[in-house]
């Protein structure tokens, strides 16, 4: 199984590269999709405004691959970009694959950004949910997704508000947490992604 991590030109991709290799993927880092990969990964580095411009400019290529059944994994910001729009750095368009908006965590009594370990609450079970319910994973973010279609939410996390931890529709999966920084639970989730692609 081949995975390509899309390099937006910001941040360190070594952790997600290593995490994917550990669960069995052949991994490459590239600025463009190759067309023969089983999984395209949008990593969780950068800002919505900068990354959305990079990815939306290549949306047509990604759309062709998505319609052909290539899997997509978005991590943190990489998941947020899959929604219609986000407010970080001004109002910017996302890829629009998931309906809804990305906005700041809106709660007066929690510290922003949300950095550290928090619990995943699975609300919809499929192969991607196996072994992660009630487990702690690592977060580092100030913005969250507010989906208009709640059926895409597989699991949530509570931090002042309940927000999506994992979303999935068709061949698209996104996580607000960083599986590559979430120790054994993160590895289990990436293993789930590997098996999900093979089914």
Swiss-Prot record:
One of its GO terms (molecular function) is glutaminase activity. It catalyses: 5-[(5-phospho-1-deoxy-D-ribulos-1-ylimino)methylamino]-1-(5-phospho-beta-D-ribosyl)imidazole-4-carboxamide + L-glutamine = D-erythro-1-(imidazol-4-yl)glycerol 3-phosphate + 5-amino-1-(5-phospho-beta-D-ribosyl)imidazole-4-carboxamide + L-glutamate + H(+); L-glutamine + H2O = L-glutamate + NH4(+). The keyword Amino-acid biosynthesis applies. GO terms for cellular component: cytoplasm. It comes from the Archaea. Its EC number is 4.3.2.10, 3.5.1.2. Residues 2-199 form the Glutamine amidotransferase type-1 domain. GO terms for biological process: L-histidine biosynthetic process. InterPro entries: Class_I_gatase-like (IPR029062), GATASE (IPR017926), Imidazole-glycPsynth_HisH (IPR010139). Keywords: Amino-acid biosynthesis, Cytoplasm, Glutamine amidotransferase, Histidine biosynthesis, Hydrolase, Lyase. It is found in: Cytoplasm. The active site is at residues 76, 178, 180. Pathway: Amino-acid biosynthesis; L-histidine biosynthesis; L-histidine from 5-phospho-alpha-D-ribose 1-diphosphate: step 5/9. PROSITE patterns: GATASE_TYPE_1 (PS51273). IGPS catalyzes the conversion of PRFAR and glutamine to IGP, AICAR and glutamate. The HisH subunit catalyzes the hydrolysis of glutamine to glutamate and ammonia as part of the synthesis of IGP and AICAR. The resulting ammonia molecule is channeled to the active site of HisF. Heterodimer of HisH and HisF. NCBIfam families: IMP_synth_hisH (TIGR01855). HAMAP family: HisH. This is Imidazole glycerol phosphate synthase subunit HisH. It comes from Sulfolobus acidocaldarius (strain ATCC 33909 / DSM 639 / JCM 8929 / NBRC 15157 / NCIMB 11770). The gene is hisH.
